[in-house]
Amino acid sequence: MGNTVTCCVSPDSSPKEGRDREVTESGEPYQAQGEPQDGDVQHMSVWELPIDLSNERNPSDDAQTSTIFLCKSQTDVREKRKSNHINHISPGQLTKKYSSCSTIFLDDSTVSQPNLRSTIKCVTLAIYYHIKNRDSDRSLDIFDEKLHPITREEVAHDYCKHDPDHKHIYRFVRTLFSAAQLTAECAIVTLVYLERLLTYAEIDICPSNWKQIVLGAILLSSKVWDDQAVWNVDYCQIMKDITVEDMNEMERHFLELLQFNINVTASVYAKYYFDLRSLADDNNLHFLLEPLSNERAQKLEAISRLCEDKYKDLSKAAMRRSISADNLVGIRRSNAIIS
């Protein structure tokens, strides 16, 4: 009952009697892992979890796990700080503004409405650290740029040996977002899908596949996140050298590798947003801060009310969809008797 695990065994039979005589390949007696000793009954929490539940530690699924890009960037951040300390170099501008009781400094980026330009810079910097500090060059043919080129330009024979810099990645992503008119939230979801793909498929993003992987993540996130989704043929008009068939095939493989898990919870989204802010702070990509004025305060209040009304409408719509014919979910009010 409850949290206690028990089993019923016949008094004249012992489940251990035959099992203890089993011998493994190494010649040692077999003993089940986690077997209780001295007749004690173990709790379910100490049992080994099945493999299917291992993805709970995936940062793109679990809000408690640190993002992969932030962990990969820490090596460069520590080396940069150590080098600056040894060479007595200032880490950057010492004119960072801090809020006080009389003045509050804010930027125009919030978790509900991030700044597009700053968010793309942070996301592409995260992709840059993924490529630079990758563990190996594991990849799949569907994402190989030479096997499936997205431009008619001839791919260099040593294309897999040169890591792209941050500016190159930023120009590639910014071109897609500007042409497709995508939002900053879509950029954050793109990074979530990218890290989920690397974890699920057990591959690395490297010079030979980064364009295909980033394009597939943007394509999928734009369809999931934006209300007015961009069609594959629209991306073919942006990148005129790729066919619709190739785009459809890449999207299909991307979804299969994600195991069709395109869900992004609010907590995971918020974690990626704030980790991107931390990444920007570690690399001196400071957001433009301005003093809080009455006009900006009213604008922030209007944005908050708009988001609050939006979430209320979504919750009401979900409630209406969940009401059955018997009105089991509906709120019932008793009739008042006025005497």
From Swiss-Prot:
Keyword terms: Cyclin
Domain Cyclin N-terminal: 141-263
InterPro entries: Cyclin-like_dom, Cyclin-like_sf, Cyclin_N, Cyclin_Y
Record field: compositional bias (Basic and acidic residues): 14-24
CDD domains in alphabetical order: CYCLIN_CCNY_like
GO molecular function terms attached to this record: protein kinase binding
Keyword Flavoprotein attached: no
Signal peptide span: none
Keyword Acetylation in annotation: no
One cellular-component annotation, GO: plasma membrane
Polar residues compositional bias, start-end: 1-13
Region (Disordered): 1-42
GO BP field: regulation of canonical Wnt signaling pathway
Family from the record: Belongs to the cyclin family. Cyclin Y subfamily.
Protein name (record): Cyclin-Y-like protein 1-A
Upper lineage: Eukaryota, Metazoa, Chordata, Craniata, Vertebrata
